[in-house]
UniProtKB/Swiss-Prot annotation:
Subcellular location: Apicolateral cell membrane; Cell junction, Septate junction
Extracellular-facing ranges: 28-53, 109-130
Residue intervals annotated with topology Cytoplasmic: 2-6, 75-87, 152-157
Topology term for the membrane: Multi-pass membrane protein
Transmembrane intervals: 7-27, 54-74, 88-108, 131-151
Native source species: Bombyx mori (Silk moth)
Superkingdom assignment: Eukaryota
GO cellular component: apicolateral plasma membrane; septate junction
Record keywords, A-Z: Cell junction, Cell membrane, Membrane, Transmembrane, Transmembrane helix
InterPro entries reported for this sequence: Ssk
Protein name, UniProt field: Protein snakeskin
GO biological process, any: septate junction assembly
Length: 157
């Protein structure tokens, strides 16, 4: 019999995958079909920081792959993966990484000024703020998944 925690975990992981794909598409094509990025420079008159972009790309793509692998293991129906401490650690670290990437994006795009300095609404700014907000929301979902992972881990002990 499948437990309620297992079903909840599969639903949460599926939602994380969908949200992660949305973030990835916006991150990659949010600037009128071109690369949007998260910014990551503290001087808003400069170009985007490549270090922040590398970390953001790693978090977005890395956690997409990790979550896909985790959901595949759940779909196999075995219980071995539920006893693994690695899922708790990865989800816990994911909370901080997603919130950090979202905070950098919100900081950069919140102060963004486009080419026309007296225009206040820019499509890329709105998409950048959406990416930042979605990353923070994804961090909260990873916190929920961390709690579910702890429940699985303690229940199986």
């Amino acid at each position: 019999m499948v437990s309620v925690q297992t079903i909840a975990t599969i639903v949460v992981k599926t939602f994380k995958i969908v949200l992660n794909i949305i973030i990835l598409v916006l991150y990659r094509t949010g600037y009128n079909g071109e690369f949007l990025g998260v910014g990551g420079t503290w001087n808003l008159n400069e170009e985007k920081n490549p270090d922040a972009e590398i970390v953001a790309s790693g978090v977005i793509v890395g956690y997409l792959i990790y979550t896909l692998v985790q959901i595949v293991t759940f779909l196999f129906g075995t219980t071995e993966h539920k006893r693994a401490l690695s899922e708790i650690v990865m989800n816990f670290v994911g909370v901080f990484l997603w919130i950090a990437v979202g905070a950098v994006a919100l900081h950069y795009w919140g102060g963004y000024q486009g080419e026309h300095q007296f225009q206040f609404v820019f499509a890329e700014k709105q998409v950048g703020l959406a990416v930042g907000a979605l990353c923070v929301i994804n961090g909260a979902i990873y916190l929920l998944d961390t709690a579910l992972s702890v429940i699985h881990f303690t229940k199986e002990m």
